Amino acid sequence: MRKATITRKTKETAIEVAVDLDGTGVSQVATGIGFFDHMLDLLARHSRIDIKVKADGDLHVDYHHTVEDVGIALGQAVKQALGSMAGITRYASLYMPMDETLTRVAIDISGRPALVFKAEFPRDKIGEFDTELVREWFNAFAGNAGITLHVETLYGENSHHIAESCFKGLARALRAAVAIDPRAAGEVPSTKGQLGG
């Protein structure tokens, strides 16, 4: 069973996260940040990974700590659920349209964390949500999941659509990359015989 639960508690946040990589895309998300909840719901639905997130953060300060810490915990949960990574497809790439916006996402579940994130938002905020936090979340997630992740919005005019195409693109890429390849016969997809380092 490719499942994991992570609890993260600091002076700034208390986070509980659970994932099931072989789920159906069910989400139970409560961060206190409406737009962020929407993005995490999309992530679950389009990746077909069951995701539970309960976050209590210092929202009276701003949303930064909560968004980043959820990224950390969710990344750790995905990494733990992947285990030895035996039999996974490992790589995926795609283009994700969202109305006038087009984003390209490529992923390598390599065990070597790296993020290249290129998206420009026309506005500083989506409602009360700072658009710079989109990159912060992706950085925290990729770093803690141990994945190499490239996200590039090729064009777009609406900040909501740009953010949504990034999250949906990640979701669909994750869905493909974590899938078990029946032809791999349980082997780790690396000539080294292991992933990471």
From Swiss-Prot:
Keywords: Amino-acid biosynthesis, Cytoplasm, Histidine biosynthesis, Lyase
One Pfam family matching this protein: IGPD
Any one GO molecular function term: imidazoleglycerol-phosphate dehydratase activity
Any single Gene Ontology cellular-component annotation: cytoplasm
Keyword Cell wall biogenesis/degradation attributed: no
Alphabetical list of InterPro entries matching this protein: IGPD_sf, ImidazoleglycerolP_deHydtase, ImidazoleglycerP_deHydtase_CS, Ribosomal_Su5_D2-typ_SF
Subcellular compartments: Cytoplasm
Broad class of the protein's primary localization: cytoplasm
Metabolic or biological pathway: Amino-acid biosynthesis; L-histidine biosynthesis; L-histidine from 5-phospho-alpha-D-ribose 1-diphosphate: step 6/9
Protein's UniProt name: Imidazoleglycerol-phosphate dehydratase
Family per record: Belongs to the imidazoleglycerol-phosphate dehydratase family.
Organism: Rhodopseudomonas palustris (strain BisA53)
EC number: 4.2.1.19
Annotated PANTHER family: IMIDAZOLEGLYCEROL-PHOSPHATE DEHYDRATASE (PTHR23133:SF2), IMIDAZOLEGLYCEROL-PHOSPHATE DEHYDRATASE HIS7 (PTHR23133)
